[in-house]
Amino acid sequence: MPPIAHLLETALYVEDMDRAAAFYRDVLGLRVLDASPRLVAMDAGASTLLLLFRRGATLDGAATPGGWIPPHNGEGPAHVAFAVGAADLPSWEARLADHGIAIESCVRWNRGG
């Protein structure tokens, strides 16, 4: 079987779309690729998308030029981890602190990140 090429997308379901999009755009520097009242799609690097869905807005499916997207809606806590280079970690820690964001924990994984 051929290996998986990469993670295509991560979807988060948010109550406050403007606030969530502003965080990922203004604090983390992700570029907005597409935006609508139900979805903001952002470039998360390496051909990966971060999708922010307004909670409850995806209970009905949607027709797209690429095909039918079935209904979905996330519930409960979620976890997303972004990789940064070891040399860049102090800069990211300072940037997050400048925006009042507390770091719960720093973990170094043997596989990177």
Show which residues each predicted segment covers.
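Polyanion-binding surface elements
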Residues: 11
